[in-house]
Curated annotation (Swiss-Prot):
Pathway: Carbohydrate degradation; glycolysis; pyruvate from D-glyceraldehyde 3-phosphate: step 3/5. It comes from Enterobacter sp. (strain 638). It comes from the Bacteria. One of its GO terms (biological process) is glycolytic process. PROSITE patterns: PG_MUTASE. InterPro entries: His_Pase_superF_clade-1, His_PPase_superfam, PG/BPGM_mutase_AS, PGM_Phosphatase, Phosphoglycerate_mutase_GpmB. This is Probable phosphoglycerate mutase GpmB. The record marks 150 as: Transition state stabilizer.
Length: 215
């Protein structure tokens, strides 16, 4: 059975400011660095063999802290990037017009073809993150990879494993530096293939960040 751990990056400056990041970037805050150190301490006990991270700066920062704790190198994979949020990137959530808020909601409220202008659909996101996950099956036997990615990207991945469409209404909250686990297995009791063992665990964090869109 292959176990794959999933970690969202630590809190960033734009998370704290409630700005839309997408594939734009901002650095980790001091709190985000502390979250990364705390999830790294947990990861150190899990027998992690590979760290695979989105190539955006905030995930690289988080991955470096985890990799140092686990004694692993980092493999960068752009397929693990966050959803491209198009023309809304860098905008403050509270500054959106009604029309712009409508664009954002089509992504997370179950609209199949929803996308922000110049951005990416949830289905396109799903295809690339699923491909990145599938490549974990090519790792040597006995591997235990940890993927460092983003809130919407990881939420989409876990939700589709549970059988929801990529564009389903968002019902899974993955806070900064939460940890999830998915397993690939053959089982007489569960569906064969990927199953969700744990999602969004923050028990290792002393002060988890709020979801920036829920404040």
């Amino acid at each position: 059975m292959l176990q794959v751990y999933l970690v969202r990056h630590g809190e960033t400056q734009w998370n704290a400011e409630r700005r839309i990041q997408g594939q734009s970037d901002s650095p980790l805050t001091a709190k985000g660095e502390q979250q990364a150190r705390q999830v790294a301490e947990r990861a150190r006990t899990l027998g992690i063999t590979h760290i695979i991270a989105s190539d955006l700066g905030r995930t690289q920062q988080t991955a470096r802290i985890i990799a140092d704790a686990c004694g692993c190198d980092i493999i960068l994979d752009p397929r693990l990037r966050e959803l491209d949020m198009g023309v809304l990137e860098k905008r403050h959530v509270d500054s959106l017009t009604d029309e712009e808020e409508g664009w954002r909601r089509t992504l997370v409220n179950g609209t199949e073809d929803g996308r922000i202008p110049d951005g990416e659909s949830m289905q396109e996101l799903s295809v690339r993150v699923q491909a990145a996950l599938a490549d974990c099956l090519k790792l040597p036997e006995g591997s235990r990879p940890l993927l460092v990615s983003h809130g919407i990207a990881l939420g989409c991945l876990v939700s589709t494993i549970l059988g929801l469409p990529a564009y389903a209404e968002r019902r899974l909250r993955l806070r900064n530096c939460s940890i999830s686990r998915i397993d690939y297995q053959e089982s007489p009791w569960l569906a064969s293939g990927w199953v969700v063992e744990m999602a969004g665990d923050i028990s290792h964090l002393d002060a988890p960040a709020l979801d920036e869109l829920q404040r």
